[in-house]
Amino acid sequence: MPREIKDIKDFLLKARRKDAKSVKIKKNPENVKFKVRCSRFLYTLVITDKEKAEKLKQSLPPGLQVKEVK
């Protein structure tokens, strides 16, 4: 089941959870989507600012598997 998250801090808390498996980063010309797969839900965060997206990518937990999709 998908869920959309509006807050960056809330997304980082979800990404640091024990059941978070992987993060997919989808880049479009107008926005960047971060999708974190947890055991029950797929949480999605949409960011329109490219600089914020790069900072968020750097602050993801190191043990999490990150896949970039063009």
UniProtKB/Swiss-Prot annotation:
Tell me the Gene3D superfamilies matching this sequence. 3.30.720.90
Q: Which GO biological process entries does UniProt record here?
A: protein-RNA complex assembly; translation
Q: Which GO terms describe its molecular function?
A: structural constituent of ribosome
Q: Pfam families in the record, alphabetically?
A: Ribosomal_L38e
Q: Which InterPro entries match?
A: Ribosomal_eL38 (IPR002675), Ribosomal_eL38_sf (IPR038464)
User: Which keywords has UniProt assigned to this entry?
Assistant: Ribonucleoprotein, Ribosomal protein
Gene Ontology CC: cytosolic large ribosomal subunit
Which family is this protein grouped under?
Answer: Belongs to the eukaryotic ribosomal protein eL38 family.
Q: What is this protein called?
A: Large ribosomal subunit protein eL38
